[in-house]
Amino acid sequence: MKVKCTVSYDGTHFKGYQVQPGQRTVQTEIESALAKMHKQDELVPIVASGRTDSGVHAKGQVIHFDTPLSIPMERWPFALNSLLPDDIRVLKAEEVDESFHARFSVVSKEYRYKVSTETHQNVFTRQYACHFPYRLDADKMREAAGYLIGTHDFTSFCAANTEVQDKVREIYTLEWKNVSDGLEMRVRGNGFLYNMVRIIAGTLLEVGSGKFHPDEIKAMLAARNREAAGKTAPSHGLYLWEVFYDN
């Protein structure tokens, strides 16, 4: 039986999602919990929609795994959560067809990036939003965001050391919302390159602060050079919000 789970986690104290020897990761914790449920020494392998970096959070990460256990679907979250640390929670479990793949069946993803513009950093949210206490022109940020919507080569907006050859992606929506303590960027697309969302966020923050003009985004895209775009925003403001599949 193949099980699909929606998982939420606070990335603060993890060295990212993916297994790393000697490090605390989300994947390791979930696979360890599954091993206990299956009463075996070996980890039960899971597959995720994608990896997240150290410090990045997830509201709706999706994983799948195969199991011989005949536990009712509604009991899986309770069973797993009883074995998981408090900074990981399984929100939902459902049986899926054998053809489903948490990574390769993805149609689109939504990420959110939270920015606190308060004068003094809020000690209670310092790990969950990027603190940017400078004057921001949100209208210019929204104008610049418009140039990124659509299908583009995002070479300038991904880590220079990425091994991915095809850097063409499509962004469906990209908007900045006013929230109680600042701004929130919401972006949905068919796929994202390594550090792409954080580089977009960092660049648009620099547009808002006046370092770049909104229409300079067009030249950044055309340059296809990481050095043409702005800074990479800190990881702790980023959330994998939702993963979308057909049906």
Curated annotation (Swiss-Prot):
The active site is at 53 (nucleophile). One of its GO terms (molecular function) is tRNA pseudouridine(38-40) synthase activity. Keywords: Isomerase, tRNA processing. GO terms for biological process: tRNA pseudouridine synthesis. InterPro entries: PsdUridine_synth_cat_dom_sf, PsdUridine_synth_TruA, PsdUridine_synth_TruA_a/b_dom, PsdUridine_synth_TruA_C, TruA/RsuA/RluB/E/F_N. It catalyses: uridine(38/39/40) in tRNA = pseudouridine(38/39/40) in tRNA. Pfam families: PseudoU_synth_1. It comes from the Bacteria. Substrate binds at residue 111. Its EC number is 5.4.99.12. HAMAP family: TruA (MF_00171). Formation of pseudouridine at positions 38, 39 and 40 in the anticodon stem and loop of transfer RNAs. Homodimer. Belongs to the tRNA pseudouridine synthase TruA family. This is tRNA pseudouridine synthase A. It comes from Bacillus pumilus (strain SAFR-032). The lineage of its organism: Bacteria, Bacillati, Bacillota, Bacilli, Bacillales.
